[in-house]
């Protein structure tokens, strides 16, 4: 995060915001700047990626599903907008520790004898390490003592859209992001790689809520994609993983996606629409649409 803050200081904070008497390494200034940068970055990343996904990837026919809530998209957005600033507070405390040199983040690839190999290995280890921790944290959030107050708000969205990706209770959102912050305090990681991975995991979080269940056949047994995560939203006790199915298989919580068996929400909506169309046809209303141009859905 120091790379982002350095750029923000150089181009904005130092020349336009803070007085010259307030040095860039002042801890109070750094805290304020990190809060601004973290929140601004989170909102930009969320709205940019979720909006693109919603309009160009998300299957809008899913909005006809009976478990899709009234005004759901706007509710997902409002929930996220309210939660992100609260999530940023503990997040910034960890960024501050990184910024002040308490982590194992490094600048120079040459710090390691096999620098590029180490860099590539660190990417793989980051993904597997964080996937493991997120699995157990996520599964723990389903415990009856904490689920109702902390994790249930995210499960309101049975048929999620990309905008539901960050619609968490603040404690839930921070806990599930915690593994990404723990890693650089335990293992060496290049600063640019860390920043790139941090963006990647947020984009991935959006992608597993996008309703696009296409995964190459050869990867289906290994990748925890949108189909897996949609089943998690619908059935609760399965597919807790973030990227891979490994820990769900080890923990006995893996469920083969119902969508891969023709029993998922897409199939439900398709069958429902066909039945409604046939019903209209039988009543002499074949091809007639109502209201806003869509067939009404069953209550």
From Swiss-Prot:
Residues recorded as bearing Phosphoserine in the entry: 253
Residues spanned by motif Histidine box-3: 228-233
Residue ranges of the TM segments: 32-52, 79-99, 117-137, 186-206
Membrane topology field: Multi-pass membrane protein
Motif Histidine box-2: where in chain: 151-155
Catalyzed reactions: a Delta(7)-sterol + 2 Fe(II)-[cytochrome b5] + O2 + 2 H(+) = a Delta(5),Delta(7)-sterol + 2 Fe(III)-[cytochrome b5] + 2 H2O; lathosterol + 2 Fe(II)-[cytochrome b5] + O2 + 2 H(+) = 7-dehydrocholesterol + 2 Fe(III)-[cytochrome b5] + 2 H2O; 5alpha-cholesta-7,24-dien-3beta-ol + 2 Fe(II)-[cytochrome b5] + O2 + 2 H(+) = 7-dehydrodesmosterol + 2 Fe(III)-[cytochrome b5] + 2 H2O
The protein's role, per its UniProt record: Catalyzes the penultimate step of the biosynthesis of cholesterol, the dehydrogenation of lathosterol into 7-dehydrocholesterol (7-DHC). Cholesterol is the major sterol component in mammalian membranes and a precursor for bile acid and steroid hormone synthesis. In addition to its essential role in cholesterol biosynthesis, it also indirectly regulates ferroptosis through the production of 7-DHC. By diverting the spread of damage caused by peroxyl radicals from the phospholipid components to its sterol nucleus, 7-DHC prevents this form of cell death.
Stated name of the protein: Lathosterol oxidase
Annotated source species: Mus musculus (Mouse)
């Amino acid at each position: 995060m120091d790379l982002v803050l350095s750029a923000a200081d150089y181009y904005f904070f130092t020349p336009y915001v803070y007085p010259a008497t307030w040095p860039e390494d002042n801890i109070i200034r750094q805290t304020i700047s990190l809060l601004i940068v973290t929140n601004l970055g989170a909102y930009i990343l969320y709205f940019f990626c979720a909006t693109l996904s919603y309009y160009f990837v998300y299957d809008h026919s899913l909005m006809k599903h009976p478990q899709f809530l009234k005004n759901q998209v706007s509710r997902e957005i409002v929930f996220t907008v309210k939660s992100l600033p609260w999530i940023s507070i503990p997040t910034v405390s960890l960024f501050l520790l990184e910024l002040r040199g308490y982590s194992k983040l490094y600048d120079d690839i040459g710090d390691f004898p096999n620098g590029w190999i180490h860099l590539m290995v660190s990417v793989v280890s980051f993904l597997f390490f964080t996937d493991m921790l997120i699995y157990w944290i996520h599964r723990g959030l389903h415990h009856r003592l904490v689920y109702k107050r902390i994790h249930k708000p995210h499960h309101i969205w049975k048929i999620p859209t990309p905008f539901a990706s960050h619609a968490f209770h603040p404690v839930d959102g921070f806990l599930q992001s915690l593994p990404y912050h723990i890693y650089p305090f335990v293992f060496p990681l290049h600063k640019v790689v860390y920043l790139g991975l941090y963006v990647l995991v947020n984009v991935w979080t959006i992608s597993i809520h996008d309703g696009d269940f296409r995964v190459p056949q050869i990867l289906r047994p290994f990748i925890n994609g949108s189909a897996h995560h949609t089943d998690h939203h619908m059935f609760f006790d399965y597919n807790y993983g973030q990227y891979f199915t490994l820990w769900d298989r080890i923990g006995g919580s893996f469920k083969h996606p119902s969508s891969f068996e023709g029993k998922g929400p897409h199939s439900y909506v398709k069958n429902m629409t066909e039945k409604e169309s046939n019903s209209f046809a039988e009543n002499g209303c074949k091809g007639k649409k109502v209201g806003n141009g869509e067939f009404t859905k069953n209550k």
